[in-house]
């Protein structure tokens, strides 16, 4: 029987997904791959359905305040990590009303400075201006809100990643996202992606942390490009970065008021999902987000890796969803045009060096 590449991927994705693919190379009796420290611990994810973005965001965070409070009370300031992969397309970027919703949640309870931060692929401050963050910060002067271009701040820690040839290469990660005094809030959206299937909270943190040259700096350099070394290497490097950032993650806020389908993360089309998702477990938040987008959860490799390594719960059976039900808010997002190539991380590697020993 002749099976096309398209038919193969759809068949595998529909029947067991990642498990089915791994079964081709795993011998009989191979134990499940998991490093979860406490398999009995469940995560809570709140889903709020509504029509007012700002209120939905605040309501989602308030729903899990009992989990946020014990940690944030030990911190000195709040970092809101936005997602401005584009500095000109609002659909691809965190909306100012999302930030307002976060501030509405924070201010009555937690009187501490707030820094809105980003390391955009382009000019970070251009995005801050275009999307209304500069006005927001000015209007919030009494709340001690500031804007920080992480590229211009130029403070970092170095971690090793792998390149296409599996050799080590250094990458500079924004130090502020690793500051133990900061309570880090991820403010992102529901979007499809051109490399890793879907981008939600983990992707926002992991690819927002690597820096590039500061404005007017020469010679130019860009550590974000080091993640685009190969479809398999990308997922693994994202895992390594998530592992480094994870101890400083506070709460993930996924703004699904208007998601993006098709050719995300910058050039897709809007989907009126009208939801907000919040959790102190970024991996669980993203699993619920993927479900709400109607995406096969086996497809985003980096999220499966993070779940296997115990960075959070990716198993839907270990997630308590409060508020709206997934089935009631789920929409089937159209995938990126390159989805077939994106899924090639799942199969066997064909061009490998010889085996020795």
Predicted regions and their residues:
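N-terminal and secondary-structure boundary signal
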Residues: 2-357
